[in-house]
Amino acid sequence: MYWKVIKFIVLIIIPLNFILGMRISNIEALKMNRYIKVENDIRLWVETYGDESDEAVLFISGAGANSTFWSERLCKALVEKGFYVVKYDHRDFGYSSKIDYEKNPFDVMQLTKDAITILYSLSINKAHVVGHSMGGFIAQLLAIHYPERVLSMISASSSTNAESVPPPPSETWEIFMENNPTNNFENDLEGFLKVWKYLNGTAEFDKELAVEYTRNLYERQEIKGAIGASHVKAQSNLNDRTEQLKKLQVPALVIHGEEDYLVDKFGGVQTAECLESSRLVLIPEMGHIPFNEQILARFEQEIIQFVEKNRRKTDSN
């Protein structure tokens, strides 16, 4: 019996662990960071995971969020399933070029063109596009203006920008205004944690997740005053996309938290109603940004399952 156990370990367990280890190492080896020039002196920080010949997934963060919003776990899970993952920092945020917005203003349509430029630079003809909050606006605009480049679309914690979407409660802006970062992580952390706890919704708040998220912001840039202010200004000329979304044929998933106090859940419901080929997922207790491991895992699993379901039958890029 003893030798049978030893034989099982030698013949099965050790080779399996070796193979799994090689697979993880290969994923790490296939991660690349680079800058992509999108306009004049503007360069965007871009991270890619996996084999560039595989079907692509483009992750688009929201205002005041860098690429770390999309976890390593999520990216690697998609690579293991045979996808090429791309995520990046928007202009004027994270590692990407900083801009004097008053001298060189931009809008969300320009941010949409940035996304297309990234795909072009990476020789990606089509991609599954996944956007959160403002990133959801960009994902929608990609599907509207560049339908030939979009395999499927996920719009999370976003809306159509219709006037019928209820505005955030006054408490939301009050909490935002109370947070006045000074580029000192230790001193500023308490203010950010208050904001993150509020945006988390009613689920149990995971402080460790929130601290890591905040630290990632400080590691990439100076954090002073209103975070992502230029991105908020960039949204000022957004129009209602209801009628444009109704014309889309792209497979779509709309994810929204039941307790989103920044973008009301009606924004997600209405977005799904506009899209002919869509599925709506409302996650109980989830707010605008999930700082709860269980809810975050659910959020990521919904993305993985949808992208897998809408994988193309051919291997052409």
Regions of interest found by a model, annotated:
Residues 248, 254-256:
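Short beta-strand/loop motif that positions the catalytic acidic residue
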Residues 153-183:
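Flexible "cap/lid" loop of the alpha/beta hydrolase fold
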Residues 173-243, 250, 270:
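Alpha/beta-hydrolase
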Residues 278-317:
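Catalytic active-site module of serine/aspartate enzymes centered on a nucleophile-bearing elbow/loop
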Residues 261-267:
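Conserved alpha/beta-hydrolase "acid-adjacent" motif
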Residues 125-165:
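Conserved hydrolase catalytic core segment
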Residues 109-127:
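Conserved acidic catalytic loop of the alpha/beta-hydrolase fold
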Residues 42-98:
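Conserved HGGG/HGGXW glycine-rich cap/lid loop of the alpha/beta-hydrolase fold
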